[in-house]
Amino acid sequence: MSDNDIRVGVGFPLGQLACALTTAGTHEDEATRQRAELRVRRWQQVVDGMAGGGLDIGSRTPVRGLPAWVTPEVVHGGFATGEPAAGGPLRPDETDRAQRLGLPADRRALFWSWLTDAGLEELGELLDSGRYRVKYAEETALPVVAWLLRAGERDAALGVLDEIAPFAERLRFTPAPSDQRAGDPDVVYRQTAGDVRRILEQRQPNAQIETMREALTVWNPFADELLTLWCETRDGGRIGAVTLDGWLPRAVQLLARYQQLTAEHTLCSKHRNPKGSIGVLRTALERRVAGAELTPRERGLVQSAVDAMLRKRGQPGSPEHTALREQQAREAARPRHHQLAQLVAARLAGLPQDIGIGDVDHVLRPVDADEAHPAGVVAGWPTPRPVARVVTRAAAGTLEQLIDRGVIASAEELARLTPRLAAATAASAYPDPALRILTDATYRAFRNRRSLLLLNLEHQVRVAELPWVQAVASARTDTSDTRNQARRTLVRLASAAVCGFPATLLPNPLVGELSTLSKQASLQLPWVEELAADIFMGTFSAKFLQAAKLAGRRLADSLYARYYDIDYPAIAAIDDTSRRLIRRTRTSDAFDHLCRDRVGASGKRSWFNVAANGVIIEQAQILTTHNLATIAELGIDLPSTYLAKRCMDTVLRLTARIHHNPRPLGTVKNNAHAWRQMLFFLSLSSWEGQEAFAAYAEKRLATQPDHVRTRLAPAVTGLAHVISGGKFDADGRAGTGRRLLGWTTTEHWMLDPGPRD
């Protein structure tokens, strides 16, 4: 960094450390406290590293002494802790290898053991088998060295070793062995069978349910016996009038059993209440067994308790009482969720643990007859929804299938799964099968690398910067087939994102994948990331101007341009992108000024005013359509009206969440995102379709609660006004209509619409 660059302070890490300390010291759940203690250690590392100069947060190389290609351990907000992610204790397979070879239990010894003839032969066998599991990209470095040596690329292999050997003591450079090869890249899953099995195995009994079962199976029958015993003393309805032969010995037995039940069944406490029915009858029984006569007050309490119990449930043994107890017994006999969770976990134990579940329905089938008795449940009982929801997270299928099933429920979840497909596409350019599998694993592991907090227009480390990836670059073949495959994957992912989640901004990880695929397909398309308002540097890279120009070619004079008052021809005329002396990233002063001018901001940058930064960033998103125009450039057939209606559904849902929301600004911002995407899709439809949509929006709004109608009516009115040919004034108003934006430096008009109840 230069002296002119902005640096990150310790305020945020200190705040996170304080929160973690509070949770670790006060939370009632032990597992939560343990997780908080881990966060405390990591945030303490961040604070200490920043204070001591070991960390340079905001840089691509935030950890002193570690090159950019090392995967750093990163905590919330993109802060590096100072530790490498591929470090830590030896894995079990590493420990086994050290013991087998008689080596010291340290990584340096293991590192050099792989470079012996025997070690290289093992690596070669591992490469050919494809049976390994890569968690961090560093773990493919030595397998690449083995491949290079086998391919006769000795100098390239030595070059990789020169880069990684200085870190042999801290990092692991080999993958963990696995029982299985990598599966079909087209099949994805959110979690593995092993992941959900462990979750189900940890499912504990529900305390409330268990308490209810104890009441139904233990204390209700005891209460019936107690009531029956007292009813035997009635004469003409008066309790305690007679004492039959054998009554007192049976009373002694019942009280002894009460002591036993109390010791064995501790969940219920109602029976201990001396003023409750059981408490009154039991206390009176103890008095009689002790040889004392009941006082008039005690006799009256017993009489009242017996009469109340008989009125409520009837005489024990009567048809109505028997029917009630039989119904309660059936309720108590219902399998509990934790029992069924354990049963399903046992089914999952027989499946491959490192991949998803191909046939979820079979795993979730009703209880088999041979499973019922060992599990203590009823044969034919269906799997409860809470258990099914956990298992479904491991469902394996194509992206489209998982979106349709609701397994992938957000664009963020989609973004987490796309590296598998993108990795296979990138690896397809390597003809050698072993190297292709290894490259696929490297790419997927690299995409799981957490993003760093970066300042001064720095970009995240790219996979091509890894020394071992550079070393095999010459083995890559760029053909029309590989380019076509990259384009197909690009179109597929973009289509899945925009059609699956039309009201959501593309998450930055997905934007990165689409950008990489575009380059592999030889398509020069501008993909822009969502910028963080709290670290915005006041300028945009040149690709934002390129994206705005691309949007203008499609949207000039459209509903979108008229709604947001965009002069796309003027944007097309901007041509001032250039490289700056203090950074490598190209920028456009004219585009920066345009974004600030559109919100009436001064020329002075507002690095430390989040709201002021947010309104400027939002204008860049408006001008560029935040990747929607770029997606349309791919020629994807977008069902525009259908997508616009789905956006409207999201807008209504988000508007409803504003009501009584103590922190509504994030919801308002997401609402504006959905509204903007709706406008883009509407702009792709005909004028007749737009008019019909305006009527549709008003009709949908009319069915909403008062607080939703009041908050959203200005936006719907403003939309109809622009569709009919009108314009907003300089303040974004048109009569009672308003232009809907997400960011503001004053109170947002949606937050004070009038009625609050």
Stretch-by-stretch model annotation:
Residues M1-D757:
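Long, compositionally biased terminal regions
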